[in-house]
């Protein structure tokens, strides 16, 4: 209730909402009820969320459920202690996840297409980012290698056997990341012209809802200007266990486009998987996370091999 106390006066001042009851949904989001019984969704956010929603509104995006405008005609209310927005509360009940996932992909496509603009890849800004990623990956792979060596030096048991058996997929991911990074850097050096757009950056299924028979995107607080591959990589990882033909979905999507998009998509998927493997020391790793992650990497190689491309 502390956060609601901070914004409670502003709910009255900027929205004429007199709070009578609430239900926490997350640490920053609440379902609230006013004195008339009407329900709202209130979420604490960052101050720059205002500019994001205003940008999308000005671009004419109609597949977004925007927050309610306050009395200053702004989507986000900002004060020295907190920034927040208010939306009508929509009770979205989804029985089958697969159709909803497909609808979200459609709405992400719509978002990217309507905010798209051309920009050349810039070696000056991209090189430091990839050098940082390379250093992080090198450190992570070194820690994993040391950990596996420590496991091999001990007697086999029910814990160590599946870890050792699945380590090959980590090595496969390492080789693939090097190969993809080489290709991405080639695109950067060539200063390829790439479509940038507004990416949702948190494309979880609960961030699309069905309202009056149409699907809308919500919770774009983390959105930013970037390459669509980021949204698709995060979407795939969030939903990889659904019964969807991801192989054909993404091959068909990237077919005919600059190979950079598909390379970057695959690079990000593997990067996120490897980042999951938190090696606390040479002696310990969470076996359950290791097995599930390496199984995901194995599935990656089934879904996302090169198509009509020469292996490098």
Residue locations for each model-derived region?
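A glycine-centered beta->alpha junction motif in the catalytic cores
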Residues: 82-97, 145-153, 273-291
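ATP-binding glycine-rich phosphate-binding loop
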Residues: 5-35, 70
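ATP-dependent phospho-/nucleotidyl transfer catalytic cores
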Residues: 124-198, 249, 303
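Regulatory N- and C-terminal appendages and interdomain linkers associated
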Residues: 1-18, 47, 168, 175, ...
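ATP-binding pocket architecture of kinase catalytic cores
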Residues: 35-125
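Active-site acidic catalytic loop and adjacent metal/ATP-binding pocket
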Residues: 29, 67, 179-232
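Active-site activation/catalytic loop segments of kinase-like enzymes and analogous catalytic loops
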Residues: 228-259, 272-300
């Amino acid at each position: 209730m502390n956060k609601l106390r901070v914004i409670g006066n502003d709910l009255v001042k900027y929205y004429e909402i007199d709070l009578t009851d609430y239900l926490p949904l997350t640490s920053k989001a609440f379902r609230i009820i006013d004195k008339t019984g009407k329900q709202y969704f209130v979420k604490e956010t960052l101050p720059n969320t205002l500019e994001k929603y205003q940008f999308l509104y000005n671009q004419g995006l109609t597949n977004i459920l925007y927050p309610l405008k306050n009395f200053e005609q702004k989507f986000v209310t900002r004060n020295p202690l907190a920034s927040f927005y208010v939306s009508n509360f929509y009770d979205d009940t989804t029985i089958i996840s697969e159709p909803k996932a497909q609808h979200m992909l459609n709405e992400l496509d719509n978002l990217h297409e309507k905010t798209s603009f051309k920009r050349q890849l810039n070696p000056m800004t991209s090189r430091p980012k990839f050098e940082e990623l390379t250093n992080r990956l090198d450190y992570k792979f070194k820690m994993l290698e040391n950990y596996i060596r420590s496991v091999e030096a001990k007697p086999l048991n029910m814990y160590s056997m599946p870890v050792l058996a699945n380590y090959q997929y980590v090595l496969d991911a390492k080789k693939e990341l090097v190969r993809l990074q080489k290709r991405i850097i080639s695109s950067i050096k060539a200063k390829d012209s790439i479509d940038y757009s507004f990416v949702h950056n948190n494309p979880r299924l609960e961030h699309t809802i069905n309202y009056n028979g149409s699907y809308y995107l919500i919770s774009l607080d983390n959105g930013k200007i970037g390459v669509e591959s980021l949204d698709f990589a995060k979407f795939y990882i969030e939903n990889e266990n659904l019964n969807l033909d991801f192989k054909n979905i993404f091959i068909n999507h990237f077919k005919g486009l600059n190979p950079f998009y598909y390379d970057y998509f695959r690079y990000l998927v593997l990067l996120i998987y490897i980042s999951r493997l938190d090696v606390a020391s040479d002696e310990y790793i969470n076996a359950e996370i290791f097995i599930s992650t390496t199984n995901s990497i194995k599935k990656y190689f089934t879904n996302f091999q090169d198509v009509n491309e020469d292996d490098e």
